[in-house]
């Protein structure tokens, strides 16, 4: 898994290719197409690889009497139930068409999380390149089967899951991909709270997913700031997903735990800087180290004047900077050899000074 083989446009864990960054607009458009368009422009400006929305119909997603999660109650007090909140956050099919066209025209990949089979079929009709499975649907076996039957790349978030639940999800989709599963599936570690505390992140679980299932992994981040997603890249994440908003003060469930456009841009730059810092993994001096190496390493140097033909003893030598001459590791080959010319004390010995 350390090769540079692409996984449907996404790098495998441990490769030297760039991380796939998803700017998660989610429902931060508040049901407003113009605000959704602004999010597409901002995602492109940030340097992210994709902008992602959410595709659902409240009528087929949630019972009308289900209460909201605690963070939803705190962040979106204007609605009394999940249904009421989500109904106001729907995008129409026409909205999706327009957002997809805008993203394509800007050169940023359009993505959306479809929450049911009909939404998945609609997204495929829009030409999406991959499907994103949200954490809440990971135990929805009929839905997983429907998604996998499309034979598109899958990104599965694993928030609120234990390993056995992830294993069942993988076993559900695997028959549709066979031995090519690792070319199509990326698992995202995730903590499903908005915002997630550092204590709850448990980022090492991302590595556990990679080790347990031998699949590419990434991280869907709900913490505040850029530390955790940047660290995840250093730990091998090939996908990073991060919520962003045009304005954190807007009403709605996810704005407070989202980045503003400038922060999103900073995150993308931080990830790209992290990739640069990680490098290729090959242990060798950098081009900028080579001049310094010559100055701070030692060479075999004459301690006293010697004439041509003199046999060199250990007492004739001292090891001094710079390291432009014969290396100290060759001293056993130099002691007992003879000079090919007259040399003065302080001369940095070169091989041309030694008789063949």
From Swiss-Prot:
Q: Does the keyword Lyase apply?
A: yes
Single GO BP term: glycosylation
An example molecular function term from Gene Ontology annotations: transferase activity, transferring alkyl or aryl (other than methyl) groups
Q: Which InterPro entries match?
A: AFP_Neu5c_C, AFP_Neu5c_C_sf, Aldolase_TIM, N-AcNeuraminate_synthase, Neu5Ac_N, Nonulosonic_Acid_Synth, SAF
What's the short name of a Pfam family annotated to this entry?
A: SAF
Is-annotated flag, keyword Lyase? yes
Which keywords has UniProt assigned to this entry?
Lyase, Transferase, Virulence
Where's the AFP-like domain? 299-356
Reactions catalysed, semicolon-separated, are: 2,4-diacetamido-2,4,6-trideoxy-alpha-D-mannopyranose + phosphoenolpyruvate + H2O = N,N-diacetyllegionaminate + phosphate
Q: What is its EC number?
A: 2.5.1.101
| Top class in the EC scheme | transferase
The record describes the protein's role as: Involved in biosynthesis of legionaminic acid (5,7-diamino-3,5,7,9-tetradeoxy-D-glycero-D-galacto-non-2-ulosonic acid)(Leg), a sialic acid-like derivative that is incorporated into virulence-associated cell surface glycoconjugates such as lipopolysaccharide (LPS) which could be a key determinant in the ability of L.pneumophila to inhibit the fusion of phagosomes with lysosomes. LPS contains a majority alpha2,4-linked homomer of legionaminic acid. Catalyzes the condensation of 2,4-diacetamido-2,4,6-trideoxymannose with phosphoenolpyruvate (PEP) to give N,N'-diacetyllegionaminic acid.
Q: NCBIfam families per the record? A: NeuB_NnaB
Instruction: Give the protein name, as stated in the record.
Output: N,N'-diacetyllegionaminic acid synthase
Q: Where does this protein come from, organism-wise?
A: Legionella pneumophila subsp. pneumophila (strain Philadelphia 1 / ATCC 33152 / DSM 7513)
> Which gene is this protein's source?
neuB
